[in-house]
Amino acid sequence: KPYQKIVNMIEDKVLQDDCNRIINSFLEKAEVVLAEVLQKREFANETRARLLAYSGEILMSHVMNYILKSSGIKSEVIPFDVWPIITDNNLESANFLASESSEKMAETEKLLENNDVLSIGGFIGKTVEGIETTYERGGSDRTAADLGILFSKKYHTRIDFEKDSAVLSADPRVVKEELESITSLSYNEARIAGMFGMKILDPIAIKEIVENGVEMPIIITDMGRPEKITTIERKPSEKNGH
């Protein structure tokens, strides 16, 4: 059980028991959805979104919340009943609805004001009617961008991504020598690079930021070498290697 290995890292017995109860409740929901899949012989639309949410993204956000709490961090999870990411009805390739999402931000802002860290599952949205939806590939990048858009109306906001690599001057799978680290990119440069194959950041995430008229830095940090950082801004202050 992969989740059990994580739960065992929580030293506080009360938090550990609470976390186990949450995991079991979500997995029970996932089992109900799986039964529907077997009955309908179809893994699509809201059934697909519900299973991905209950067995993965939303469940993991609750587990992360308990891990943070066990480390003494004042944290909370954003529950699905006050989910701030509202999308259209394209259930498997949803589109972010900024105006409708802004109307749902009050509870999330209240949680933020009372805590230091909030956890939320990526990739998942819901319609105005409350039906679960999913973004396409790269959806977690879009979730971060969408939250940045929503929070920027009230807070000074930036987005930090920890990735397998910061941005390089060429595809390291193709070019093996003389690769340079790119420290600065514009929104447009990053979006175009994504459209032509750069996998580090979903270009739709940047497109949504631009379309909503938001200016906030996007920081890409190499997890293995955290000194390697790329900053993406509307008007970058520095140019190198591109």
Where are these regions (language model features)?
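Core structural elements
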Residues: 21-39
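A short, GP-enriched loop/loop-strand-helix hinge that lies immediately N-terminal to
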Residues: 45-50
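C-terminal catalytic "cap/lid" subdomain
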Residues: 1, 8-11, 16, 35-40, ...
